[in-house]
Amino acid sequence: MQSDKVLNLPAGYFGIVLGTIGMGFAWRYASQVWQVSHWLGDGLVILAMIIWGLLTSAFIARLIRFPHSVLAEVRHPVLSSFVSLFPATTMLVAIGFVPWFRPLAVCLFSFGVVVQLAYAAWQTAGLWRGSHPEEATTPGLYLPTVANNFISAMACGALGYTDAGLVFLGAGVFSWLSLEPVILQRLRSSGELPTALRTSLGIQLAPALVACSAWLSVNGGEGDTLAKMLFGYGLLQLLFMLRLMPWYLSQPFNASFWSFSFGVSALATTGLHLGSGSDNGFFHTLAVPLFIFTNFIIAILLIRTFALLMQGKLLVRTERAVLMKAEDKE
């Protein structure tokens, strides 16, 4: 019966916040370099905050009512990485609040950074005991230590904590460099990813571009050599993603496609930063086409997600008994 089913949204749904707020930040920056209103950027940021609030409420409610289901997600070799999206999006929301209400931004950042560090220490260090299955090695492994530390650096830059931002940036960069060879080796040589996991490949687009965005946040926005090199590697990853489109589009659209969104939105922001540094040249030429392209991708994701919501296919409901501990099923 429908009454026996309860809302069960996996932590991966926080990925919707990543791309939405990331594009909001891109439009905020666009309003500084172009004669466009800041309201579009602020509107996307507010939309992302609302989505984050709803998802956070659902996640906390599930944690309180069905802690066993959250524990199962945290212990899952693949899904556990996506749980780290909760502190990641909390820190992005903190960045969104910086121009409006700094004390709240500091509180959200403080909470998010403590949670992300604690979870990364528990989850990632736990993988070092040699029991992580090879088939569970996917780009999702970037999330706890790479994405979260880059976002921490971005938040530090927005709040003016430059030295702390550099520390987090270093943690993210070296985590990225240590993980990428392992992940690429698995993708190349250890069997094809199952269809349901192929959209996790979208995360592969993010590290270089989010690292570039984090570096620009802590270096005062200077489009220096390092920023351009990171951007270049991000563009190369974009070409790889385009090449593999038929492969990961072999499944119907679902919320997991938002894994591409944070890298895409970071492409927009970093492209604008580098392009606004001059009135001509390579980056100036790329800035507008890339900005249009990224807006097109995010718009498609928003429209398709809204369609899923209207069709009743977005909000996952699960039998109550499945979410309860075995001893509580009676």
From Swiss-Prot:
<feature type="topological domain" description="Periplasmic">
    <location>
        <begin position="276"/>
        <end position="283"/>
    </location>
</feature>
<dbReference type="InterPro" id="IPR052951">
    <property type="entry name" value="Tellurite_res_ion_channel"/>
</dbReference>
<comment type="function">
    <text>Responsible for potassium tellurite resistance when present in high copy number. Ion channel involved in potassium tellurite resistance. Otherwise, phenotypically silent.</text>
</comment>
<keyword id="KW-0406">Ion transport</keyword>
<feature type="topological domain" description="Cytoplasmic">
    <location>
        <begin position="60"/>
        <end position="79"/>
    </location>
</feature>
<feature type="transmembrane region" description="Helical">
    <location>
        <begin position="255"/>
        <end position="275"/>
    </location>
</feature>
<dbReference type="InterPro" id="IPR038665">
    <property type="entry name" value="Voltage-dep_anion_channel_sf"/>
</dbReference>
<keyword id="KW-1133">Transmembrane helix</keyword>
<feature type="topological domain" description="Cytoplasmic">
    <location>
        <begin position="249"/>
        <end position="254"/>
    </location>
</feature>
<feature type="transmembrane region" description="Helical">
    <location>
        <begin position="102"/>
        <end position="127"/>
    </location>
</feature>
<feature type="topological domain" description="Periplasmic">
    <location>
        <begin position="29"/>
        <end position="35"/>
    </location>
</feature>
<protein>
    <recommendedName>
        <fullName>Tellurite resistance protein TehA</fullName>
    </recommendedName>
</protein>
<feature type="transmembrane region" description="Helical">
    <location>
        <begin position="139"/>
        <end position="159"/>
    </location>
</feature>
<keyword id="KW-0813">Transport</keyword>
<feature type="transmembrane region" description="Helical">
    <location>
        <begin position="225"/>
        <end position="248"/>
    </location>
</feature>
<dbReference type="InterPro" id="IPR039264">
    <property type="entry name" value="TehA"/>
</dbReference>
<feature type="transmembrane region" description="Helical">
    <location>
        <begin position="284"/>
        <end position="310"/>
    </location>
</feature>
<dbReference type="GO" id="GO:0005886">
    <property type="term" value="C:plasma membrane"/>
</dbReference>
<keyword id="KW-0407">Ion channel</keyword>
<feature type="transmembrane region" description="Helical">
    <location>
        <begin position="195"/>
        <end position="218"/>
    </location>
</feature>
<keyword id="KW-1003">Cell membrane</keyword>
<keyword id="KW-0997">Cell inner membrane</keyword>
<keyword id="KW-0812">Transmembrane</keyword>
<feature type="topological domain" description="Cytoplasmic">
    <location>
        <begin position="1"/>
        <end position="7"/>
    </location>
</feature>
<feature type="topological domain" description="Cytoplasmic">
    <location>
        <begin position="190"/>
        <end position="194"/>
    </location>
</feature>
<dbReference type="GO" id="GO:0046690">
    <property type="term" value="P:response to tellurium ion"/>
</dbReference>
<dbReference type="InterPro" id="IPR004695">
    <property type="entry name" value="SLAC1/Mae1/Ssu1/TehA"/>
</dbReference>
<keyword id="KW-0778">Tellurium resistance</keyword>
<dbReference type="GO" id="GO:0046583">
    <property type="term" value="F:monoatomic cation efflux transmembrane transporter activity"/>
</dbReference>
<comment type="similarity">
    <text>Belongs to the tellurite-resistance/dicarboxylate transporter (TDT) family.</text>
</comment>
<feature type="transmembrane region" description="Helical">
    <location>
        <begin position="162"/>
        <end position="189"/>
    </location>
</feature>
<feature type="topological domain" description="Periplasmic">
    <location>
        <begin position="99"/>
        <end position="101"/>
    </location>
</feature>
<dbReference type="GO" id="GO:0042802">
    <property type="term" value="F:identical protein binding"/>
</dbReference>
<feature type="transmembrane region" description="Helical">
    <location>
        <begin position="36"/>
        <end position="59"/>
    </location>
</feature>
<keyword id="KW-0472">Membrane</keyword>
<feature type="topological domain" description="Cytoplasmic">
    <location>
        <begin position="128"/>
        <end position="138"/>
    </location>
</feature>
<keyword id="KW-0046">Antibiotic resistance</keyword>
<comment type="subunit">
    <text>Homotrimer. Each subunit forms a channel.</text>
</comment>
<feature type="topological domain" description="Periplasmic">
    <location>
        <begin position="160"/>
        <end position="161"/>
    </location>
</feature>
<dbReference type="InterPro" id="IPR011552">
    <property type="entry name" value="TehA/Mae1"/>
</dbReference>
<feature type="topological domain" description="Cytoplasmic">
    <location>
        <begin position="311"/>
        <end position="330"/>
    </location>
</feature>
<dbReference type="GO" id="GO:0055085">
    <property type="term" value="P:transmembrane transport"/>
</dbReference>
